[in-house]
Amino acid sequence: MPDDLFDALGRQAIPTIGQDSGAKLNDHQLGGFDEYVTHSRLRNKNVISPSSIDAETAQLQPLLMRTESLTFLEELVNTPSPTSYETRGQRVWLDYVKKFADETTHDDYGNCVAILNKGGGPRIMLAGHADEIALSVNYIDENGYIWVKRMGGVDAIVSKAQRVTVHNAKGGVLGIIGNPPPHMQKVDGEPKVPKITDLFIDIGCSSRKASEKRVRIGDPITVNQNFEILHKDIAVARAFDNRIGTWSVAETLRLITESKRKLNAEICAVSNTMEEVGLFGARQIAYSLDPDVALVVDVTHATDYPGISKQAHGDIKMGKGPTITHGICNHPEVVKRVEQVAVKSKIPLQHETVSATSGTDTDAVFWTRGGIPSALISLPNRYMHSPVEVVNLKDLEQIPKLMGAFAESINTTDSFSVKI
């Protein structure tokens, strides 16, 4: 990938593994997208975000979460991190978590690690993936329209008529995913379900030459839908999948650090890359760290809204706490310990099962090297892989508490092995 695009997304601002990760992005690297976001916020005065809640609104919409933690979540979600171009989001994560870590590092593909109690044992990996589903520029036609490829599980149906940003070497270009009005859509029989190859982006240019001055083949594209409070503890955004995971592992380090309780284990909080396109980053960093046990955090499907079959997908509700998953990649002894600390800490847990794979980084971690004992903790999420994912922040707050309690429960002699 070209160096100037890496510069624009900030990759070269992150030091190599073993160095302190305190470098800052400069104004040129931040580019035009940040200016676009700022102006968008000013235009949309009805958006409720933790940085703009007045006293009256706060009374109407009480937020239980610590203000700094909520602001961190908002910044993580609002910072574009298209899969395989996660660097800007990784910088946000590192800047926050370094206050609670002994050391922060990253590898060549941008998988970031914050280590607490280095040299302790056993080694625990707490992992969430930093990337989000995205599109990329595939073709520019003679009229300047951009045609795209999918990066991850983008739903073409909900993508139409969305505002997007094409991330170029200078920052970002505003675009619209085109959609003919209903008056002009001819339907014979059943309506046609759109495919990714049907999507085109209008950036306001009328020729290929004009568009090529602004974007190029391979530029990543993300939807412009930022964090908002929907009502009380309910929030909506694109990319809660899986900023809630990277937020959770960072907050776990904070809780452990601030508790000042004795810690035996070495904690490696991980913000890994490229989950949405093959679980690649988790596989890379799990191999490098070689942990004794791993907890993976991701979203799961809430099934508490119309049109979803509980018989097929289980009974998972928002507001009832995170879930623990049973089966396959989830080691029974790790799951048992998670359940025990949840009971002791009075943290509500819901239960779900998998029949083959979980579709998360747990699938990659558990068979890395000789097999790393792992478990999946998930946050119920409505409307996953859409621009309007909805989660309960009270559920989210339970996850770092649960992982922190798990980490603090570990003794130096503990091992996770099936009892035979």
PLM regions: where:
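N-terminal hydrophobic/helix-forming segments and targeting peptides
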Residues: G10, F33, H39-I420
